[in-house]
Swiss-Prot record:
Source taxonomy: Archaea, Methanobacteriati, Methanobacteriota, Methanomada group, Methanococci
Name of the protein in its database record: Uncharacterized protein MJ0979
Keywords attached to this entry: Cell membrane, Membrane, Transmembrane, Transmembrane helix
Membrane topology listed for this record: Multi-pass membrane protein
Gene Ontology, cellular component aspect: plasma membrane
Transmembrane segments: 11-31, 85-105, 109-129, 174-194
Organism: Methanocaldococcus jannaschii (strain ATCC 43067 / DSM 2661 / JAL-1 / JCM 10045 / NBRC 100440) (Methanococcus jannaschii)
Domain of life of the organism encoding this protein: Archaea
Compartments where located: Cell membrane
Amino acid sequence: MLPKKIDYIKIALIVVGIIALFLPWLTISASTINIKTDEGIHLSVNLAPFRVSSDIKSDTNNIFVEMMMPYVKQYFDMAVKEKMSTFMMIFGIIPIILYIASIFVDKKAVVVGAGIAGITCASIFVVLFTVGLNSSDSGLALTGGKEVTPIDLITGVVNEKSSYLSKDIIKIQVGTGWYLTMIIGLALIAYPFIRKV
């Protein structure tokens, strides 16, 4: 009995699909947002799958600012993590869900679905966050270009003024990334059924 012919194209597609599946994870892990305010406060956000870490420090000699830094960090962490943690999980989980769901339908849908979902998520996430959060010359893009002083941060006003992050960007990304990925994924999963009809 002759050995079964190896389908190298199928193997190559599976490999490409697996790589594409993890593309958002790799890209997000390499993303860091650095912002500096006019008061000399450095804000840094490190993005990783299922996790958002932030750091804040000051290069000013202002004693008041130095004393208030722990409180500034507290509110900065709240503003960033509360807005982004759920969003990060969505973008990490969607490709995996599509991948697993496709396995039970069609092997080609696995590869194509994972690849497109992965590339879509990674592209939208990186472009919008990198361009959006670094678009302000004053370094205040995190707060929509609005002036935010240490006192504003301390009193939690940053949660109100950070509309650029909490509303615009998140809305655009969740809207575009979520629906586009789901539509493509569902179409790919449904394709084998439509093809057989």
